A protein has these predicted regions:
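Cysteine-dependent deubiquitinase/ubiquitin-like isopeptidase catalytic cores across multiple families
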Residues: 2-122, 126, 132, 138-491
């Protein structure tokens, strides 16, 4: 096996990463029902040793990987965060690279401060859904706080990718005319490094080599601030430490598996409890239904002298999270076209889901393959409390793809609307995308009015700190059986 060091490749590949291990604090438990709090919050010495052993094994497992190459089709469009790219020129590859590398990449970390109530100092092996949720929220915050044309200036070349003509010919080109190959132009910086240096500084592109990026020190400082909010430190508002604390309200503990629906509600509460976000709300759909009245109620809550000029007085921007289930034990192929149409929308900020017990963050697709960011790579903790902490490990230059058929049906879809007009456009565009489903029932729906009018608890500003309400599909009168024990709606 061609194994390389953690600094050599950014991704775990293959099917060996599963997050279905038992909690490190469950040694005394018989495996039936929830683990008693008294056991879990007071780990004894044996539990600590066991947790350290498991953590050490996971650090090794997720810190090394097999080098592979991702191939992109030069004759088919690729969609990334609502934008289309056709790799028929180096300019188009460069445009894609700038957007992809600018995405915030959050992965397993090791050696961070101990999580409260446990002996864990790493989330390796169990925290991938938390990391995927963090990436989804980070994308929403970048849209909310930074200019729409912002690009990260530390432009890394794409690593381990190739661009090929995967079809006999392009309809727009005469027979016999081949497209140029760009693979030689985008060699991995790893292969060009000084083996003893361990640094890619000499191969990093300067701002002058990134003509579309522009430079604004205040914007770059804000970008760094956003990343710091996801740091692995107890004070980081969206870090693993805070999310684990919020998970306790849903009966979860450090070391447990977190489903995409639970993570959606954890993100909602995390944003609501962060004072800096007076101009942003997070809404989580209930029963695969977005109640427009509830969204309006959240967004029309009073603001405190923040941005309201573009969306009407007192209007908050909103991140909408929709937990869904796209099949039974596996993805229903009838929903693939619908998922593609959703990922084509500018208002879509990604999907958290992945393979079974192996969460990924989906940000686009090409043909029948999803484009994703993978959290299953263990990196040393970065001290984000330092003013000039390194951003390199929070951005990825290795795009990865997988077939739609490998996508787990349990997922959460994210959307962002900055203004009231944007929200209205979102409802229209997403509804049109949902209508492309070949199934009788859409993935989810938009409904006028409020959830309480249908017997559900709404998500008003006053209820944001309450426990997450996760509803089953029993109220939806759909004669389908549940395909698993997860708390998602089966379509």
């Amino acid at each position: 096996m061609n194994s390389v060091s953690p600094s050599g490749v950014q991704y775990m590949v293959g099917a060996g990463a599963h997050d279905d291990r038992p909690s490190a604090q469950s040694r005394h438990h018989n495996g039936h029902g929830p683990v008693p709090d008294a056991i879990r919050e007071e780990p004894d010495e044996v539990d600590r040793l066991k947790a350290k052993f498991i953590s050490a094994w996971n650090n090794v497992k997720y810190g090394w990987t097999v080098k592979s190459k991702t191939t992109f089709n030069k004759t088919s469009p690729l969609f990334l965060l609502g934008q289309s790219y056709l790799f028929n020129s180096e300019d188009e590859v460069e445009r894609f690279r700038q957007v992809f590398v600018s995405c915030v990449w959050l992965t397993y970390r090791r050696e961070f401060p101990q999580l409260e109530g446990s002996s864990l100092t790493t989330d390796c092996g169990w925290g991938c859904m938390l990391r995927s949720g963090q990436m989804l929220l980070a994308q929403g915050l970048l849209l909310h706080l930074l200019p729409t044309d912002w690009r990260w200036l530390e432009c890394h070349p794409l690593s381990d990718v190739d661009f090929e003509v995967l079809k006999p010919r392009s309809p727009s080109r005469p027979a016999g005319m081949s497209l140029p190959s760009f693979s030689s132009s985008w060699t991995s910086p790893i292969s060009q490094r000084d083996p003893g240096s361990g640094s890619a500084e000499g191969h990093r592109r300067t701002p002058e080599q990134c003509p579309a990026a522009g430079h604004d020190p205040q914007v770059e400082a804000l970008h760094r601030k956003v990343v710091s909010w996801f740091g692995d430190h107890p004070s980081a508002p969206f870090g693993v430490h805070q999310l684990v604390e919020l998970g306790k309200e849903s009966g979860k503990r450090a070391g447990d598996w977190y489903g995409p629906s639970v993570v959606a509600h954890m993100l909602r509460k995390a944003v609501a409890r962060t004072p800096v976000f007076h101009s942003l709300a997070v809404y989580v759909a209930q029963d695969c239904t977005v109640y427009k009245g509830d969204v309006m109620g959240l967004c029309e809550s009073p603001l405190t002298q923040e941005r309201s000029e573009s969306g009407g007085t007192g209007w908050k921007s909103v991140i909408i999270l929709v937990p869904v289930r796209l099949g039974g034990e596996s993805l229903n192929p009838s929903y693939i076209e619908c998922v593609k149409n959703i990922l084509k929308l500018n208002c879509c900020i990604g999907i958290i889901g992945g393979k079974p017990k192996h969460s990924l963050f989906f940000i686009g697709f090409q043909d029948d393959q999803l484009l994703y960011l993978d959290p299953h790579y263990c990196q040393p903790v970065v001290d984000v409390t330092q003013g000039n902490f390194s951003l390199e490990s929070f951005h990825c230059n290795s795009p990865r793809k997988m077939n739609f058929s490998r996508m787990d049906p349990s997922c959460t879809i994210g959307f962002y609307a900055q203004t009231k007009k944007d929200f209205e456009s979102l409802c229209s565009a997403v509804s049109e995308a949902l209508s492309s489903s070949k199934e009788k029932y859409p993935i989810f729906t938009f409904v006028e009015g409020m959830g309480q009018n249908y017997g559900l608890e709404g998500q008003s500003a006053g209820s944001m700190d309450g426990p997450a309400n996760i509803f089953s599909c029993n109220r939806m009168s759909r004669n389908n059986k549940r395909g698993s024990t997860d708390e998602f709606v089966l379509l």
